[in-house]
């Protein structure tokens, strides 16, 4: 929907119409689509002769969806408030000329990919190289945009290792050839703290591990306001992952991940580990 009111129509009073057919105002973007977590700049064009004398006013019909603020050079910045649809309006200060454009605010669930180990993976992965390194903050999502999500080791691991192993999951080899691990006979429990999550939003956690060994079942326990458990056999694992769905963070926006040998782990050192994790927002 795009409506223009120019020479034959007034935004306020038909008796005050400026009949010059040379004068116009127009939003350059006939429709605007943006995510809830981003802003957008829109611009307006006015006729060349009188443009400098026009003072433009910007507004949105529903301020519960977005707000708009005029800036220099006949532009305005839109800030989303909530998912929904509304209309942008620009008008001259005298109310004689105005123009409308559609605005749609959407929310695409964020997904973050994390690769554990010293060999970096390309985007969209966030690379956590060593369990003794500082944690990751403002991780990039699948679109390459910063998020509020962070991850840090809060229960130590034995270390990291690289075995050069491949996968059949479509992941880069760099994601499957290195990992964080622990020998359970020395470190029976390892884990992460995931921060910056949104209260009231549920998340899915997906894990992948691969080692050329035997009996390395790993238990993943994800804990927020609720919790879930999954078991993954890492032995020669080219294509198996596990998911824990529907996890809601605690009141601080935090989820804890605890890892330990699974009940069927018979590896001599009680080896357990993880190569990659995928953190996904679930749609409401």
Model-derived segments and their meaning:
Residues 7-10:
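C-terminal motif of bacterial Sec signal peptides marking the signal peptidase cleavage site
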Residues 12-109:
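Extracytoplasmic soluble-region selector
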Residues 80-84, 198, 249-251:
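Surface-exposed, short loops/turns at beta-strand junctions within beta-sandwich domains
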Residues 87-91, 206, 258:
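Extracellular recognition modules
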Residues 108-185, 246-284:
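Low-complexity, Gly/Ser/Thr/Pro- and Asn/Asp-enriched, turn/coil-prone segments
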Residues 190-192, 199-213:
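A short beta-strand element within beta-rich, extracytoplasmic domains
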Residues 209, 213-228:
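Short, surface-exposed beta-strand/strand-loop-strand elements in extracellular ectodomains
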Residues 227-249:
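Extracellular carbohydrate recognition and processing domains
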């Amino acid at each position: 929907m795009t409506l223009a009111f120019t020479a034959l129509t007034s935004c306020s009073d038909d008796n005050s119409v400026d009949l010059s057919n040379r004068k116009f105002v127009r939003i350059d973007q006939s429709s605007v689509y943006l995510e809830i977590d981003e802003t957008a700049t829109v611009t307006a064009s006015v006729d060349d002769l009188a443009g400098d004398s026009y003072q433009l006013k910007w507004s949105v019909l529903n301020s519960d969806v977005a707000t708009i603020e005029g800036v220099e050079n006949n532009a305005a910045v839109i800030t989303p408030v909530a998912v929904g649809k509304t209309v942008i309006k620009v008008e001259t200060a005298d109310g004689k000329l105005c123009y409308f454009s559609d605005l749609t605010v959407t929310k695409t669930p964020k997904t973050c990919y994390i690769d554990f180990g010293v060999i970096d993976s390309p985007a969209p992965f966030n690379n956590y190289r060593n369990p003794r390194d500082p944690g990751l903050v403002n991780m990039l999502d699948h679109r390459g945009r910063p998020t509020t999500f962070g991850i840090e080791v809060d229960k130590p691991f034995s270390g990291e290792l690289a075995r050069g192993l491949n996968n059949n999951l479509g992941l880069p080899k760099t994601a499957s050839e290195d990992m964080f691990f622990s020998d359970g006979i020395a470190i029976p429990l390892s884990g992460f703290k995931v921060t910056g999550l949104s209260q009231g939003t549920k998340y899915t956690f997906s894990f992948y591990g691969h080692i050329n060994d035997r009996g390395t079942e790993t238990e993943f326990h994800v804990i927020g306001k609720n919790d879930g458990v999954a078991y993954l056999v890492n032995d020669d694992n080219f294509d198996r992952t596990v998911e824990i769905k529907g996890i809601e963070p605690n009141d601080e926006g935090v989820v804890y991940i605890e890892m330990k040998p699974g009940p069927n782990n018979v590896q001599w050192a009680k080896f357990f580990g993880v190569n990659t994790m995928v953190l996904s927002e679930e749609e409401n």
